């Protein structure tokens, strides 16, 4: 086990701003967009999926760099700090094993088939980037979770960010190997707060993927459950592909106990994962026998001293799950 875990930079562990401090009332609402190629074509048919697969050659993947981490945003008006307690009644959704257990390799501690690497093109600068993501069990069996900044560049002062292009998810990527193939994105969803204002407390996204050769991603790899409104102090396992560990070529893990990120709503853990692990899941109750847990956070930021942060999973995260989880 690698005891470590990104990502977006923040000034310090105690620097977080309450989620609703001076932000638009709809910051916890969500927006969706169809996935596109670099030329703007929607990924709506086999021909576009084929073009997407041809784009991500081994050479291009090797040259991709960890996703740009969100920089500091303009100061927001002060607001009373939010307490550390849950914001509502805790809830969970179940994890799901793959349909055919024989398709999984023998599990290794802290390596999960339901966690993988993401590659995409940033339309602003034309660069190729990488993040992490995780399959999550939903009615569609086609959804993965990641960070908001892995699907959208994030807005500034109400000017909306740009949706990423050529987006693919590779379950249990390992040194170029794609044991479950490459899943093309079909539709993204993230919070208004991230898309329009770059609100790091809403740096969460969910992505519907296309089936691959008739297999939905959760059926192929299994999918984690979802937890929300739990205490900010939890034993968690963080999984992802940090660029400062084996150049992001292997799945790494960090295990420890989370804490509240200063006076703000986010949670934090000392993991020291570098860029590339953005979007990796923070899991409660990871079962090493099947590599599945209950997702209660997503890798978002890093601050001084190796502290990593995740948005707090609350009722709006569950609402995002409900809104996107049945899309096929």
Regions found by a protein language model. Name each.
Residues 149-152, 173-176, 211-214, 243-244, ...:
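Acidic glycine-/aspartate-rich tracts in secreted/extracellular proteins
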Residues 57, 118, 133, 146, ...:
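Terminal peptide-recognition signature
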Residues 1-22:
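Secretory targeting and sorting signals
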Residues 15-137:
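Protease-domain processing segments flanking chymotrypsin-fold serine proteases, especially trypsin-like
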Residues 296, 300-328:
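C-terminal cap/linker of serine protease catalytic domains
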Residues 185, 200-270:
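Chymotrypsin/trypsin-fold serine protease catalytic domain
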Residues 98-129, 136-137, 158-215:
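Conserved catalytic-core segment of clan PA serine endopeptidases
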